[in-house]
């Protein structure tokens, strides 16, 4: 088209999600980790659980993930003093760990600065798939990775390059007002958070078998491709 239109980037993002939902393999990655300890789970025990590769594509198959006493979970998925309609992890409340068991949060541990370093819970052994209470309903489901069966990863989160909706018109206005070059004007509207690098994340080992395809894709580092990945 020759029409000079301005489209919301949210339309592009929505189309990308729709495309990837139909073909991208699902894996778990924890980008802001806090340790979750299942206090009544046997120490040293490891289970292999089935994870569906793509719920929208039955032919995509599945892969195995390890489950153990100590897991990494998202820090954002825990709140010590939660509001009434909070359905993630909080003391006294049950949630399901994706592809695994229902657990009930029993508390947390903090450091000298009040930062939560560990979250504690107890699991119900009868809630794993195939067990008597497997279909018991809870309102929250959380993703996780096993502490001893995952890879450390550097995650790079990309956001919008510009702070304004219409950079072309904004650049013209800045140049007119300040009588400056385009490059100088660009510096005023570039989003400083367009790239966030998170160095201490964790991801399933299965991720290293995947080609660069999904919304989060793998970029192997040259010095330790078998131990560390960049997502």
Feature locations, PLM:
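N-terminal leader/propeptide and maturation segments of large enzyme subunits in energy/redox metabolism
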Residues: 1-5
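Core subunits and conserved enzymes of cellular information-processing
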Residues: 6-219
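Cytosolic catalytic cores of cyclic-nucleotide second-messenger enzymes
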Residues: 231
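Conserved small/polar residues in nucleotide/adenosyl-binding loops
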Residues: 220-225
């Amino acid at each position: 088209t020759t029409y000079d239109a301005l489209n919301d980037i949210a339309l592009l993002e929505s189309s990308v999600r729709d495309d990837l939902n139909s073909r991208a393999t699902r894996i778990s990655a924890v980008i802001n980790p806090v340790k979750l300890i299942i206090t009544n789970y046997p120490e040293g025990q490891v289970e292999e659980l089935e994870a569906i590769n793509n719920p929208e594509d039955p032919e995509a198959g599945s892969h195995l993930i390890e489950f153990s006493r100590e897991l990494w979970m998202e820090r954002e998925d825990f709140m010590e003093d939660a509001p009434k309609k909070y359905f993630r992890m909080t003391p006294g409340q049950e949630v399901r760990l994706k592809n695994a068991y229902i657990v009930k949060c029993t508390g947390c541990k903090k450091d000298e600065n009040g930062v939560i370093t560990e979250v504690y819970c107890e699991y119900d052994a009868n809630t794993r798939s195939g067990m008597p209470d497997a279909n018991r309903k809870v309102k929250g489901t959380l993703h996780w990775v096993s502490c001893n069966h995952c890879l450390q990863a550097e995650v790079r989160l990309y956001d919008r390059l510009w702070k304004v909706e219409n950079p072309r018109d904004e650049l013209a206005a800045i140049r007119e007002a300040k009588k400056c070059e385009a490059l100088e004007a660009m510096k005023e509207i570039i989003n400083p958070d367009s790239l966030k690098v998170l160095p201490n994340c964790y991801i399933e080992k299965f991720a290293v078998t995947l080609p660069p395809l999904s919304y989060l894709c793998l970029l192997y580092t040259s010095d330790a491709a078998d131990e560390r990945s960049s997502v």
